[in-house]
Each structure stands twice: as structure tokens, then as C-alpha cells.
Amino acid sequence: MDLKLKDKHVLITGGSKGIGYACAAAFLAEGARVSLVSRSTEHLEAARHQLSASVKSSAERISIHAADLQQPELAAQALAAAEAAFGDVDVLVNSAGAARRTPPEELSAQAWHDAMNAKFFTYVHMVDLVVKKMGARGQGAIVNVVGAGGKVASPIHMPGGA
């Protein structure tokens, strides 16, 4: 299937594992250039190796950038490095972070803050930067991945469902 993604720059947060990794494989298969962002350089290196081995002719179309996206300045640095590698971001896929599962009796204001920092603000810190550039160009797409816990809160995942 040709989704017209050849040579488009796709930045994927949380791209070294799980849903983000699966998205990276799919975008690479469509010919996109993919920047992966994750906290762990080790996980990023492993993902790049696995993707290069599984998706034909993709090694030169993968860039990796380690950053804790809970820190806005590190999100900005990761974006700058990704743009230096492949130019403006055409598609942003946010798949980073997860809220800690906490039983209701252990919830505290800090648990709620931690959950918002882990999932919500990691997205906001990258979206804020990218959407301005996309708006100035008049094009681009942003996909925010939300798991089942973000749609319907369970008793032990209330902050993640907020």
C-alpha cells in the first residue's frame, strides 16, 4: 500500500518499544525517514538494529535521540537533533510514557502529578514545538497514542485515565 510517506520525516516518541516501535516499522516500510526518541540510548540502539534488520533498506532512514521528554528543554534538543538529521517533521507520533498503576488507597497529589508528567506533559512538550512549525508550513500531522487506561480509568489506573 502506498500511503505517500516516502521520504517524509516521522518523529516517534517512545519509539524504541511497544506501539511506538511498531509504528516505526510501519512508517519505514512505507519509505519514511524515522526519528526515534526514548529515554534509553540502549533501547534506541537495539530498536535501530532490529528495525534495520527487519525493514529492507532502512538503516540510513533511522535516527535515534535519547531524551527525557518530561523536561521541555530536552524535548527541544531532541527535536533539533531530529530536524538536523532529516529536516522538518511531517508526522509526529507521541507514544512515550506511561502512568504508574496505583491502588486508590495509595493515591496522592504527587501520584497525580507524576502521572500527568509521565504521559500528558511528555506529549505537550513535543506537540508545542512541532505544531507551531507545522502551522507555519500549513501542513503536518500529529498522532497521540492513548492506551485503554487513557480511555476508561480502572480502579488502579485512575491518574492514567484522567
Give the residues covered by each predicted segment:
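Active-site loop of short-chain dehydrogenase/reductase
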Residues: K8, D88-V89, M134-A148
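The beta1-alpha1 cofactor-binding region of Rossmann-like NAD(H)/NADP(H)-dependent oxidoreductases
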Residues: T41-E42, A66-Q77, A109
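Conserved glycine-rich Rossmann-like NAD(P)H-binding loop of the short-chain dehydrogenase/reductase
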Residues: E30-A47
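Substrate-binding pocket helix/loop in short-chain dehydrogenase/reductase
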Residues: P103-P104, A111-M116
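Conserved glycine-rich cofactor-binding loop
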Residues: H9, S16-G18
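Catalytic loop of short-chain dehydrogenase/reductase
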Residues: V143-A162
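A short, exposed helix-loop element centered on a Lys and neighboring polar residues
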Residues: V127-D128
